[in-house]
Regions:
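Predominantly cytoplasmic-facing regulatory/coupling regions of multi-pass membrane proteins
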Residues: 1-107, 164-273, 299-307, 311-342
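Transmembrane helix boundary and interhelical junction motifs in multipass membrane proteins
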Residues: 80-85, 117-127, 259, 273-288
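Hydrophobic alpha-helical transmembrane segments in multi-pass integral membrane proteins
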Residues: 276-279, 286-310
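Transmembrane alpha-helix termini and helix-breaking/packing motifs in multi-pass membrane transporters
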Residues: 156-168, 294
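Extended non-transmembrane interhelical loops and adjacent amphipathic helices
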Residues: 88-91, 103-132
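Membrane-interface alpha-helices at helix entry/exit sites of multi-pass transporters
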Residues: 99-104, 118, 122-123, 133-149, ...
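Transmembrane helix-loop junction
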Residues: 91, 114, 132, 250-251, ...
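Mid-bilayer segments of alpha-helical transmembrane spans in multi-pass integral membrane proteins
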Residues: 110-120, 148-157, 187
Length: 342
């Protein structure tokens, strides 16, 4: 019998592999640029700036590793708190699981973020893992989006406060005033968005699928304390991230005022959201080197801090990978609107 020709690889799958290959190339290129090239903005006043290999190796070889272990512990604790924050936002939408369930899924999302573009690549996996149907996965996606937005709100308030206070040399009272003002502005933005959601629900036809879906998200509007609680947890998560970087820097003998770290680390976290590298690697190291150089930190120290911070993130993600391998099936909520399989 004649052998049937092999079917060509689906174009979408090929595009996915090409996209992954491109991101791997970009990640390797950015890491090489950070280590070999020495980061961004290589030259100023005719003098080259970059990593001095002898000092770079000396920094890493003489690192005070107990401080780095403390940074790893803070990183893991921050992800646990982030999982609890997600639980607070997902339960009102019908995902009635204990905190440990969401913490586990959050770590799994961290693992996939190591393999997917940017630092938010695992968000899609988190939504899929807790929903058993298309509608429930959309709802889960709403909870993940709300979780991400509350985190960005806290991050924006912190970096805005730090930058304004540092650039204007504000005292403690004035800094607290700036923080309160930015926090109120952020919460007001959430209130406006939820009010728009409420109006959209009222405008949709009775009995429509879209109206029923929006109704599932209305608890955020009906219980404003949910957003307040999530934003509060977000400040804990963001401060844990800053503390982890401070501890990594301390391990390398780099000490800066708190306002420096509060302004630099959130900006680096925002840069890592860009979908140009795997897990934010390369972006993290270049951004830290560039920003810290403005505060007198040598290039090799900035890159080394980024590398050791990245290792903390990598190990936290690998914890999620182990959890994923131990349990492959999602513990998802059955959708009552869909008939059970025979």
């Amino acid at each position: 019998m004649p052998v049937a020709p092999a079917s060509p690889r689906p174009p979408r799958r090929l595009a996915g592999w090409l996209g992954l290959l491109a991101r791997i190339v970009v990640t390797v290129g950015l890491m090489a640029w950070a280590i070999v090239g020495g980061g961004v903005g290589r030259q100023q006043d005719g003098e080259p700036r970059g990593v001095e290999w002898g000092r770079f190796y000396e920094l890493l070889s003489q690192a005070d590793w107990p401080w780095w272990l403390a940074a790893l512990a803070v990183t893991l604790a921050g992800q646990v708190v982030a999982g609890i924050r997600w639980a607070a936002l997902a339960r009102p939408l019908g995902f009635d699981f204990p905190n440990r369930f969401f913490v586990r899924r959050f770590f799994e999302g961290m693992f996939f973020s190591l393999c997917l573009p940017s630092s938010i690549g695992g968000d899609f996996v988190k939504a899929v893992r807790i929903g058993s149907s298309t509608q429930l996965r959309l709802l889960a996606g709403c909870s993940v989006l709300a979780d991400r937005l509350t985190g960005l709100a806290a991050l924006g308030v912190l970096v805005g406060t730090a930058l304004i206070a540092r650039n204007n040399e504000l005292g403690t009272a004035a800094t607290c005033g700036v923080f309160a003002g930015l926090l109120v502005a952020g919460l007001a933005a959430f209130w406006v968005a939820l009010a728009v959601l409420d109006r959209a629900h009222a405008a949709l036809p009775e009995g429509s699928t879209a109206r029923e879906f929006v109704a599932r998200v209305l608890p955020y509007r009906q219980r404003p304390s949910l957003v307040l609680l999530a934003v509060g947890w977000s400040f804990v998560v963001q401060l844990a991230g800053v503390a982890a970087v401070v501890l990594v820097a301390r391990a390398l003998g780099v000490v800066q005022p708190p306002l420096v770290w509060l302004s630099v680390v959130p900006l680096v976290a925002l840069a890592m959201v860009l979908p140009i590298s795997l897990g934010g690697f390369g972006v993290r190291e270049n951004a830290l080197e560039y920003l810290l150089r403005g505060y007198g930190v040598p290039s090799e120290a900035g890159v080394a801090i980024g590398l050791l911070w990245g290792v903390c993130t990598l190990l936290a993600g690998l914890v999620g990978g182990v959890l994923f391998l131990l349990e492959r099936q999602p513990l998802a909520v059955p959708d009552p609107s869909e008939p059970a399989a025979a």
